[in-house]
Swiss-Prot record:
The gene is coiA. The keyword Electron transport does not apply. Keywords: Competence, Cytoplasm. It is found in: Cytoplasm. One of its GO terms (biological process) is establishment of competence for transformation. It comes from Bacillus subtilis (strain 168). It comes from the Bacteria. One of its GO terms (cellular component) is cytoplasm. This is Competence protein CoiA. The keyword Cytoplasm applies. InterPro entries: CoiA_nuc, Competence-induced_CoiA. The lineage of its organism: Bacteria, Bacillati, Bacillota, Bacilli, Bacillales. It holds the Pfam family CoiA_nuc. Signal peptide: none annotated. Its main location: cytoplasm. Required for optimal transformation.
């Protein structure tokens, strides 16, 4: 098979004949100045796999990944055609006795296409390893990134719920792990930059990152929330804002510290962290105000009710176990900080008053003390 990776303006290539490995049709060599070198079918005949021109950024990234996998003794094959599933991954490699289909994705891809390609590889016993082009990533603050539905496809497909990016210009991987949403499209992440010459394929693809969170960055996000005007809120956010004002006479900027807990499993929620935790906080403090026991089963049921009523949105379909873990991690944190006290297994009481803070400075100090590292 012949590839145009690294091809220059060479007229000799144009005099040679090339044929598509999939349909057998004759190909033309395109060596223009505007686009990266690529093949195109000479005639408008249907082909099972379209040969589309790729950006120079994408081609260079793919070339570097291929060369790197060769140094890793992973026996890489560039763009092999897998006839049984009619797919052609960017690179196929063998790492730790596993066959990997490395897909370097720089362009937007529809969710159904992403899912089909992922499931196709799995069907053949091949592990899909998606790597996003670094150019598609936007950093919004220290340790915070803008992550859309496009990005979450990659995260959800990863066994470690992480996002691996590669930049051919910097020749480095960027590994985002332990991703915790603050807003719907604005998430905290532990970040690791790994130059490609120092990266080990086994460690990068088959080792779970160690848990880590910089609370200082999370606290700054809370402070930005408290000082920004809240003019364009979603319906669910507005419902919560009205409830806090009606039930607690609490302005939105004065939401309690306890509704901003960075829960590792919180990525199951599409709603902002203060929304899903805010509804549960009101339920628990209502019970606490009546000196009634707060049962985990009741809090979980309340969460499901709010999901059903569209007050809380899930990012995607999730099992009851995932939802239960997220709610349990939230309650465990509140116990750790002394807000709740467990009296018997999964039964709690409110350990301290829910209100009492009216100064913004006092509230900011409370944020800092709660999330001190």
């Amino acid at each position: 098979m012949f590839h145009l990776l690294g091809a220059q303006q060479n007229q000799k290539l144009k005099r040679r004949r090339f044929f598509c490995p999939v349909c057998g049709g004759e190909l033309a060599v395109k060596l223009g100045l505007q686009k990266a070198p690529h093949f195109a079918h000479k005639q408008n005949k249907s082909c099972a796999i379209d040969i589309e021109p790729e950006s120079a950024y994408h081609l260079e990234g793919k070339r570097q990944l291929y060369v790197w996998l060769k140094t890793q003794r992973a026996s890489p094959i560039l763009e092999p055609y897998i006839r049984t599933i009619n797919q052609r991954p960017d690179v196929m490699a063998r790492i730790k006795e596993h066959m990997l289909a490395v897909e370097y994705q720089c362009a937007t891809i529809a969710p159904d296409v992403f899912q089909k390609r992922t499931e196709g590889f799995k069907q053949e016993g091949i592990i899909p390893q998606w790597i996003m082009g670094y150019s598609r990533l936007k950093r919004t603050a220290s340790s915070f990134y803008q992550l859309s539905t496009f990005h979450w496809q990659f995260i959800n497909a990863s066994p470690y719920r992480e996002l691996i990016c590669y930049c051919p210009e910097r020749r480095s991987f960027l590994r985002l792990s332990h991703i915790i949403p603050f807003y719907t499209n604005h998430s905290y992440s532990s970040v690791q930059t790994i130059p490609i010459h120092r990266a080990g394929a086994g460690d990068l693809f088959f080792t779970e990152p160690k848990p880590s969170i910089q609370y200082s960055g999370w606290t700054k996000a809370i402070h930005r929330f408290r000082h920004k005007p809240h003019r364009f809120n979603s319906k669910e956010t507005n419902r919560l804002r009205l409830l806090f004002y009606e039930k607690r006479q609490t302005p939105f900027s004065f939401l309690p510290t306890e509704v901003f807990v960075p829960v590792r499993k919180g990525a199951v929620f599409k709603s902002p962290v203060f929304v899903w935790q805010g509804f549960l906080y009101l339920f628990m403090t209502d019970l606490g105000g009546k000196r009634a026991p707060i049962r985990f089963s009741a809090v979980l049921q309340q969460c499901k009710l709010h999901i059903h009523n569209k007050n809380i949105a899930l990012r995607s379909e999730c099992s009851e176990e995932c939802l239960s873990e997220a709610v349990k991690q939230y309650i465990d944190f509140l116990c750790k900080k002394g807000f709740l006290r467990e009296t018997q297994k999964e039964v709690y009481v409110l350990n301290q008053p829910a209100g009492g803070i009216h100064s913004m400075q006092d509230l900011i100090e409370r944020d800092r003390s709660c999330f001190i590292e």
